[in-house]
């Protein structure tokens, strides 16, 4: 389990992609790009906040008891809840995530503990309080804690999900197997559905989609996006930091230092995840910010002047060597369904405005199998909930798109759809 995305993409051999490890053009490109101002440093942006309520303690050592008070709802009195720390499941620059159990109910949760500057609002907490979706990890409640040296931490109590897509994918790689296509479809569809929700309902960009940030129930295969620590509501015309998103999944406009990017960066990252699940390893395993662009160009070919302008107008005069795109059948060294190739092509557009949206991806023919009422998991069990749409998800979507999005058998089962069909 990891209710926060931890770690970077794992290293990989490039030979499995059928790509040459070097060429004169690629070597030239690497040397020349190293002299450009492509950014590869950490930046932050935050907002002010008021003084929080704080409890003492909240250690993550096994057996440590954390007591906090929940605010009453609907006139109910405040309630004291105790959690027993079980073990740390991940650490990172943000803090740590540990598994805990509620003493009162026996429920297992994940607690994400992050260092908090009391002068600032915590954007992740604000975002988590907004979200309510079957493919986004749920926030149960939160509290602040203080250590002996007066450091203040925010503790996000999250639903427990036992696995990550990263670990599931690695379990196949270790045995030299590829993930069954039905799972690739299921995971990719659920990522797109979650992104359609946050992009369309809030203008929210996750900014760190990667296998480590995708929780999955190994029995039902329901997927939930987690770790909204980098997420932000993007406002047109307002600049954002460009050093965002883990390297292997970083859209090219970010590598070019664009600051007025869009939610299309999440779409690129989703393509990287899908390709990795199909390939068994990262598609673009760059060793640095510059090398990341080299890896992309080796597969997609050199971007045109117009494509570069769409990513960052400041680079239009830069002279790139002309490298032809690598055929997808050679990249994957196996026969992919044409629908899978088509969707990858829609994800991997240099021009952000030419990438498909998350909603468009959801209605793509690749996922028609998931809309078939007879489709089952390989073990014979039913698929996880895929079409339990809430009104907020479907708001403003034309009826003809809704009809393609929600199959007839699901509409019959859904009271909301029955009332609004």
Curated annotation (Swiss-Prot):
Positions of region (Disordered): 1-60
CDD domains in alphabetical order: STKc_GSK3 (cd14137)
Tissue: Expressed exclusively in inflorescences.
EC number annotated for this UniProt entry: 2.7.11.1
Catalyzed reactions: L-seryl-[protein] + ATP = O-phospho-L-seryl-[protein] + ADP + H(+); L-threonyl-[protein] + ATP = O-phospho-L-threonyl-[protein] + ADP + H(+)
Entry GO MF terms: ATP binding; protein serine kinase activity; protein serine/threonine kinase activity
InterPro entries found in the cross-reference section: GSK-3, Kinase-like_dom_sf, Prot_kinase_dom, Protein_kinase_ATP_BS, Ser/Thr_kinase_AS, STKc_GSK3
Composition skew (Basic and acidic residues), residue ranges: 29-42
Keyword Ion transport appears in the UniProt entry: no
Protein kinase domain mapped to chain residues: 83-367
Function: May mediate extracellular signals to regulate transcription in differentiating cells.
Family of this protein: Belongs to the protein kinase superfamily. CMGC Ser/Thr protein kinase family. GSK-3 subfamily.
Protein name, as recorded: Shaggy-related protein kinase kappa
Organism: Arabidopsis thaliana
Lineage, top ranks: Eukaryota, Viridiplantae, Streptophyta, Embryophyta, Tracheophyta
Name of the gene this protein is made from: ASK10
